[in-house]
Amino acid sequence: MSQTHFGFQQVDEREKAGKVAGVFHSVASKYDVMNDLMSGGMHRLWKMFTIAQAAVRPGYKVLDIAGGTGDLAKAFARQAGPTGEVWLTDINESMLRVGRDRLLDAGVLTPTCLCDAEHIPFPNAYFDVVTVAFGLRNMTHKDRALAEMRRVVKPGGKVMVLEFSKVWQPLEKAYDVYSFKVLPWLGSKVAGDAESYRYLAESIRMHPDQETLKQMMEQAGLDSVEYFNLTAGVVALHVGRRL
């Protein structure tokens, strides 16, 4: 029976998806507020950088995986315009519902899909850009998900992974205090849920570092993989291409 990690716990692979789903069902309604508090608003700048690097043009087809509350999909839909096609997807129904409603409130009409990134329900070589922001670390089989992203992106297209990463070494101790003391406290006070935010902190520590993720993307068949460290490596944006 194969094991994987759920935060710092070892669990059966078949259990992880359900446990992660429970976390995001719990945090969905407060997700944006908590992101602002946790990052001091920096998550908006990280996403803006990702949007700029994506360089979506009118007519592009874009897939946003684990798109959550729709920040990236909203920007991409406006850039792709009426001739483009932007899909907001998430494996979690609660998160997808929040994202869909926020897009509608912003006047953005774009399709949504309940989607497991390890089994993407789209044809080969369909999208110009595929993005996943703060979602890859929660996936049970990251290698399968990356291979699926590579499968559905067109030759010449980009696969982009925005994710928490390995912070600059001199900041590690302070970052640990923030992650394991302050973050669960914020989760308790603002969202009434310390445990979910403790899991989020643990999942960040268990996620591959910058070089390891680069190698995983290359092993998935992506070329010219590069990464950009943001905020001293708290977050990294990895970009790979299908040639």
From Swiss-Prot:
It holds the Pfam family Ubie_methyltran. Pathway: Quinol/quinone metabolism; menaquinone biosynthesis; menaquinol from 1,4-dihydroxy-2-naphthoate: step 2/2; Cofactor biosynthesis; ubiquinone biosynthesis. It comes from the Bacteria. It catalyses: a 2-demethylmenaquinol + S-adenosyl-L-methionine = a menaquinol + S-adenosyl-L-homocysteine + H(+); a 2-methoxy-6-(all-trans-polyprenyl)benzene-1,4-diol + S-adenosyl-L-methionine = a 5-methoxy-2-methyl-3-(all-trans-polyprenyl)benzene-1,4-diol + S-adenosyl-L-homocysteine + H(+). PANTHER family: 2-METHOXY-6-POLYPRENYL-1,4-BENZOQUINOL METHYLASE, MITOCHONDRIAL (PTHR43591:SF24), METHYLTRANSFERASE (PTHR43591). It comes from Ralstonia nicotianae (strain ATCC BAA-1114 / GMI1000). Methyltransferase required for the conversion of demethylmenaquinol (DMKH2) to menaquinol (MKH2) and the conversion of 2-polyprenyl-6-methoxy-1,4-benzoquinol (DDMQH2) to 2-polyprenyl-3-methyl-6-methoxy-1,4-benzoquinol (DMQH2). InterPro entries: SAM-dependent_MTases_sf, UbiE/COQ5_MeTrFase, UbiE/COQ5_MeTrFase_CS. One of its GO terms (biological process) is aerobic respiration. Signal peptide: none annotated. GO terms for molecular function: 2-methoxy-6-polyprenyl-1,4-benzoquinol methyltransferase activity; demethylmenaquinone methyltransferase activity. S-adenosyl-L-methionine binds at T69, D90, D116, A117. The keyword Methyltransferase applies. This is Ubiquinone/menaquinone biosynthesis C-methyltransferase UbiE. The keyword Transferase applies. Its EC number is 2.1.1.163, 2.1.1.201. Belongs to the class I-like SAM-binding methyltransferase superfamily. MenG/UbiE family. Keywords: Menaquinone biosynthesis, Methyltransferase, S-adenosyl-L-methionine, Transferase, Ubiquinone biosynthesis. HAMAP family: MenG_UbiE_methyltr. The gene is ubiE.
